[in-house]
Amino acid sequence: MAGLPALPPGSRELFPEDAHAEPVVAVLLPLPLAGAYDYKVPAGMARPAVGTLVRVPLGRREEIGVVWGAGAGETPPERLKPLIGFPECPPLPAPLRAFIDWVAAYTVQPPGAVLRMALSVPAALEAPPPALGWRRPSAGQRAAGQRAEGQGPLPGGARLSPGRQRVLAVLDDHPGLPFAGADLAREAAVGPAVVAAMAKAGLLEAVTRSNEWSPQAPDADRPGPLLSADQQAAADGLRTALDQGFSGLLLEGVTGSGKTEVYFEAIAETLRRGRQALVLLPEIALAAQWPRRFADRFGAAPVQWHSQMGAAARRRAWRAVALGRAPVVVGARSALFLPYPDLGLIIVDEEHDSAFKQEEGVPYNARDMAVVRARLGGFPAVLASATPSLETIENARQGRYRHLVLPRRHGGAEMPEITLLDLRRAPPQKWLPTDFAGPGGSEGLAAPGGANDEAEEQKAPPPSPTASPSPTASPSPMARPARLGWLSPPLITAVEETLAAGEQVLLFLNRRGYAPLTLCRSCGHRLKCPRCTAWLVEHRRDGRLRCHHCGYQQPIPETCPACGVADSLAPCGPGVERLAEEAAHRFPKARMDVAASDTVTGPKEAAALATRIANHDIDLIIGTQIMAKGHHFPLITLVGVVDGDLGLTGGDLRASERTHQLLHQVAGRAGRAERPGRVLIQTVDPGHPVMEALASGDPALFLEVEAAERQALAMPPFGRLVALVISGEDSARVQAVAAALGRAAPMGPGLDVLGPVPAPLAMLRGRHRHRLLLKAARGVKVQPVVRHWLSLVSIPPGVKVQVDVDPISFL
């Protein structure tokens, strides 16, 4: 039939020419559906290959899906709807399709829900409209242009100005390739007006050109820094792995050992072989230094991929990857699902980081899925960390991963000295408030709120940095009572000494905002989120109370919403804003800034902060966990951990492991160059295994204790866990479904089901939540067990059962 669309470039036909006039194909749609739908291929339409993107009708709308195979043939052809056409987009590569199927099966999720992550930018599925370009005109046109300038037919444009000659030289170096005007001007080192004038004179020919983005290619042969013997041995190991197909490798190195430069060598070798490389970072949107280091090493920036990119940037990045024009991608976990035509290496940096686990939608761990993606593609996956997860360590011990170790800091720098400050013996001291403008002067923190929070400080005892006060009466408005401090005398002295030496200090407190809890001193009411089982966190900088789970916010009230008493609300416990308030009082001459995810909101802000720290425009940084990852600031010689015990409490399986990793990482920010560093950790429990391991400088000491405890309980990595989270707006329905799942719980050797119980976050975003936890022996295949379990219970409308295989959060 005339006018039917042709296949996009890169596709081939699925069916032979003598096949039935209207063959049937299975099309997977990016929707949470049970499987692919059958569609017929109209007579005369090109017959698509597996992986081809197609437009199909779905109800009254049109969707773009992917041909997943031949149709099942269960529906009569006359009842099938026909394909509409093909978007101008390369087909999904076979390894990506296999990966989508694997992830869906492993996570017990619909394959269409996984496909949606691969087709996350619908606008990228169509080619951009062609744009105007310029190229060298034909000989006849060139002569006409010269005559128009009064030059006559002089050969070679001898009378052209030097700038115009450079423009034509660029075009001669790329015969037949049209340039955008701005690109041509940049390559020839002329202004845009020169190109415009040449076009008007007929010296350039206007043509339409593809508007696809082609990022500058990194130079794999650009010389890198001289590697140490340890680095060279590790780099050789990675290069060897590139010759051997799939393998998993653990690149473990102490903080400052130069792991990045080692895996840069593997990226360079991958580029020499003409293949693509992917680097996953836990918070790429906030990692300002990594792209700079890459550009310094390879002479070009990597293609970035993360959620804070604008729609246009995501569109062009997605298509650049799909068209093979993105040699190196650095991204967040979702970059795993980009359509690489020839991926040859995956690096997972900071592989231990919990940010690699997606909790919403399709729950998956990008660290583990990266290894699967590499296995399906037949190339290496490198997991890099100074504090590897216990799961990764166990895989290395069992021989599943090759273990490469960098035991020393690069360049002769020494590891920092770590000292525990026992707050029971040297508690923080109170301080008298003065006028306070906060870091950055008028643009910093807001001034304290008055008598209500001062009253709390006057009454509450200070045994711990996170102690909560008891309600008390308001003092006289004329009083200037002492406030609770969060910095102990030894830490204050160390900060003063470091600042006096012209060096920088990082005070670490992994808690955003001003105070984690606000209560009424009159009636004891605690301000809670109306949509979640969580306290509202005060953010005094902008006068708001915020829920850190759902995003709800409200102004800080002047009266208690429960009893109506005015000026009775008191903040409890410290956040980074409150710590900054004390630091500004104790170190008034220090230039100070706060680094948290709500103050450093994206790549530009992160880059600006990193530049200010590197240029020593800041003396004292007060930061959360975003300061613990990958930063290299040679002048930071003191790290003070304000609350080392934060995160150790609660029933989280990995609480101790995560605390050890985080504190070890933040300690690694100290003394990364020729100046020695020291780390002071405030704690009320210096005998805790985490604290003892940190003080000893021997992470293996902690891992040995942690592994023994997990193995005794058959917990991961020595056992399997699957969480079922039942949620809905109707509490009774949620409880009924949870109870039904409890009654239908699987039984058998190596299986145990805990629950149902209300989740610790019993309400989240207005939905009631219950949990069950399937605990299984290491060798049990849990997915068939879970599928059968779910099939035994009818799930009513409005109730959702979320399956989380290998959970890391138990909220």
UniProtKB/Swiss-Prot annotation:
Please report, in chain numbering, the residue ranges of the motif DEAH box: 349-352
Annotated positions binding Zn(2+) 2:
C529, C532, C547, C550
Cellular component GO terms held in the UniProt record: primosome complex
Instruction: Give the matching SUPFAM superfamilies.
Output: P-loop containing nucleoside triphosphate hydrolases
Keywords attached to this entry: ATP-binding, DNA replication, DNA-binding, Helicase, Hydrolase, Isomerase, Metal-binding, Nucleotide-binding, Primosome, Zinc
- The keyword Methyltransferase appears for this protein: no
EC number, as in UniProt: 5.6.2.4
> Compositional bias (Pro residues) spans?
460-474
**What top-level class of enzyme does the UniProt entry assign?**
isomerase
Q: Which PROSITE patterns match?
A: HELICASE_ATP_BIND_1, HELICASE_CTER
- Stored InterPro entries: DEAD/DEAH_box_helicase_dom (IPR011545), Helicase_ATP-bd (IPR014001), Helicase_C-like (IPR001650), P-loop_NTPase (IPR027417), PriA (IPR005259), PriA_3primeBD (IPR041222), PriA_3primeBD_sf (IPR042115), PriA_C (IPR041236)
Q: Which residues form the Helicase ATP-binding domain?
A: 240-406
- Feature: compositional bias, Low complexity: 135-152
Q: Which PANTHER family match?
A: PRIMOSOMAL PROTEIN N (PTHR30580:SF0)
| Biological role | Initiates the restart of stalled replication forks, which reloads the replicative helicase on sites other than the origin of replication. Recognizes and binds to abandoned replication forks and remodels them to uncover a helicase loading site. Promotes assembly of the primosome at these replication forks.
The protein's name in its UniProt record: Replication restart protein PriA
